[in-house]
Amino acid sequence: MYIEKLTIKNFRAFDEDGITLQFNKGVNAIIGENNSGKSAVMDAIRIAFSTVTYKKDIFFTRADFHVSEDGNAADFALFDIYLEEVPTRLVEIWNPESVGGQGGEFHIRFERVIAANGIEKVRAIHWGIGTEGNPLSSDTFDAMDVMFLGALRDSENEMKPARNSKLAQLLRSLVPDEVTRAELVDILNSANKTLLEKEELKKTRKTINDNLARIEQDFLSQHVDIGLIEPRFDSIASSLRAWVKPKWILVSISDGEYSRAQQYAREHEDNRKIQQNEKGIYFETSILENVEDMAPELVTRINEIASSSFELYQNGLGYNNLLFMSTVLGDMAIERGGVYQHLLLIEEPEAHLHPQLQELVHTFLSDTNQGDANIQIIFTSHSPTLASKVDIGNINLIYENAHKKYCLPF
């Protein structure tokens, strides 16, 4: 299921005539000059798909009503979303009379209302096929998975250990069955047990509990245990963190394994994953994926050196953005029962990326969609490199003429 058409009226920069954008399956781009309304389109989609309360991460406010050039604010705003390849089970939005019988639609109207206490508020009315006012249920929106990556995304913080981090979400999606989750908890229990056998840990636990007993006396009599993390699957997911492995490692001329490294380099002089200079011999860490003919001592040494890493904050912003996008797309590509639409919204995916990497990003996004045709990607961009890679029929140009906003689908 994917968005085929979107109409926006009286929302921010868009007046009562509004604009209409056309989308296709796969990768779509929205382009236009600064302040043309690209971000407003993305926010309109986010608001539309977070209609049910528990899915809201963005809200429509009174400031979102369009204000005309004469200073008058609109009394209503309207979003019309038209979909294709809608399953028949989504009866609230499926339109059996559409071309091909697979179309669907839903609508959200926002109105200014005066509450009984005289305060102006915003009322939202949403409906699917049929009469305005027939509300949509949460079941319909549960079938739609929408993810947004903003232009000012903080990839470093998003990847930090937390209950709702992207890494935690990915692990929960990859390990849905309780048997495997229990196996992971058993491994953690074993690690905790081994750790607590160390005398230093025993002393730490005893010190805490002795002091606690002195404070509590006979009132609470609580006892504290310590370990790596609480032995529960959610704790494992919440504690996951990402760090960056070095691409190249150096076995220096003063290293005890230098002679073996030198011999291996001579035997594999055509291997581009091995380089040599006056400092020693460099190995690309990916060489460890196939080292059947490498001396075990050298393998061990390369692994020791490669075990060094650095935190994400020490990494470049561009590469952190790539890591973040990879994690999000990995989670979205996992098949889930009852989910028929995966929509990824990205503002300026070119942020902090060299043009060559921008090309790789587009290739990655396109390949991801081909692997799972159920993922639709819509991004905004100022990058000629990215825009030139998108099919001409998948580009929407937003522009202004004679004080009005227009959208030109190519």
Residue ranges and their predicted role:
Residues 1-50, 243, 249-410:
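Switch/communication elements of ASCE P-loop NTPase nucleotide-binding domains
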Residues 196-237, 261-286:
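Amphipathic alpha-helical domain-onset/packing element
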Residues 62-66, 94-95, 129-135, 210, ...:
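Short alpha-helical segments and helix-capping/turn motifs at coil-helix boundaries
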Residues 175-185, 192, 209-213, 225-233, ...:
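Glycine-rich phosphate-binding loops of nucleotide-dependent enzymes
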Residues 81-85, 150-153, 228-230, 244-246, ...:
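Flexible glycine-/small-residue-rich
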Residues 78-80, 86-193, 202-203:
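Electropositive, glycine-dotted interaction segments
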Residues 42-102:
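Conserved P-loop NTP-binding catalytic core
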